[in-house]
Amino acid sequence: MSFSVTSVFTFKIESTFDEWAAIFDSAEADKRHSEFDIKPLFRGVSKEDPQKIIVIHQAPEGNVQKFVEANGDWMATHRVDLSTMEETSWTASLTKDDCCD
């Protein structure tokens, strides 16, 4: 059974935050997110490192990973350093079957 997961991504960019945010907030990005039923909740920039970005999404389990796989090349053209991407996943509750391999 698929359930909603909140995913927190951090990564580095090779541009300014304003340049990156303009792309993230674009109609094209909205369209690509909606194709995977992804709802962006927050995006921001580190106060300590202007190249470090955080993005928080909510989507059905596995959809954000599918989005990154399908759109990695597009993301890289917007100067996202995919090699720095880190993810954590969060949910409102867990059953024993959902947790901990």
How would you name each of these model-derived features?
Residues 1-101:
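Short S/T/G/P-rich N-terminal loop/turn motif that feeds into the first structured element of a domain
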